Structures are given as C-alpha cells and as structure tokens.
C-alpha cells in the first residue's frame, strides 16, 4: 500500500502525498523531538522535512526507500535547526511525553532519566542513538541517513550508548555493571 501511495505521489498526486504525510507525521515528530529536545524546533523540522520531501519527491529513485529517504531529510532539518542557534529555555523546551503519556510514576521517572541522559549528548550522538534504538536502523542505514561511513555510525552509536549508560547509572545511583566500571 505504501509503495502505491509513494508512486502516486511521485507522479504528482497531492492527495497521495498528504496521506503519506498523515501516516508518518507523528513518528517524524517523535524522532525530531528526541533529537532536538524542543517541541517548537521539532515541529519546524518536521514541517520543513515534509515540504522538502514534496518538493524533491521526483528525485527519489526507489519508492521502497521512501521512509529512509524521508528520515534522512528529517535528520538534515534537525541538524539545521540545531545549528541555527535558536534555543528555548528549559521550561519552554519541556514537552509532554510522547510514549508514556498515561504511564505510572515509575515510567515517568524513567522517561525523565532518559531525557536527562539524552540532553547530555551532542546532537550527532543523540541522532545516531535515536535512529538505532528508536527507529531500529542498522549501522549501514544510519550511515546512509547521516551521510557518514558505517564505521563512524558504529562509533557514534557505541559512544552514545556508553554515555547514556553512564548517565543512567550516575543518576539512579545504580550499581555499575560487571567489573565496576561503566561500559
């Protein structure tokens, strides 16, 4: 079904593209929010990525790669937003949780710890981590999406994972994994 919508959109069918956007906008926004940590910037990046996708859709060679292509556009927009220097205060940047809106207090505490850990990462490390763990991208797919070699993608995911683990251990004052040192 998605391939049919993509092919129709590539042929100029605005309704087909609108349906693709409707189907994917929540996930795109969630990814942008995780990367940028700001609701307004995430919304701007999502809208701009969808605009660029519509404008440049005819450049897409393989309709089966639409989702990966769209995520690549979104990541570029997130980087652009992050570099633009627009910043929100911490209070303005707080966004109601996406995944755990009605979760019990323990899940909210975990979400807060994860958000604090993500905040400590650079946008490059945070993006690699989100693509790998949230979207399930393989290392070559991350490299393709970010325009970096697979080895660089691997090192970013590894480093981000190490830093997140260390942050979670420090924040929760949990015992360290085997060997007594962060991994």
Which residue ranges define each predicted feature?
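N-terminal module of bacterial RNA polymerase sigma factors
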Residues: 1-27, 34, 116-119, 166, ...
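Internal acidic/polar
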Residues: 2, 80, 88-118, 138, ...
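Short, charged helix-capping/linker segments at alpha-helix termini
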Residues: 8-19, 29-48, 150, 173
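Sigma70-family region 2
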Residues: 10-11, 37, 48-65, 84-86
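C-terminal flanking helix
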Residues: 25, 29, 50, 122, ...
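Arg/Lys-rich amphipathic alpha helix in sigma70-family domain 2
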Residues: 55-62, 72-93, 107, 159, ...
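Helix-turn-helix DNA-binding module
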Residues: 116-127, 131, 135-152, 163-166
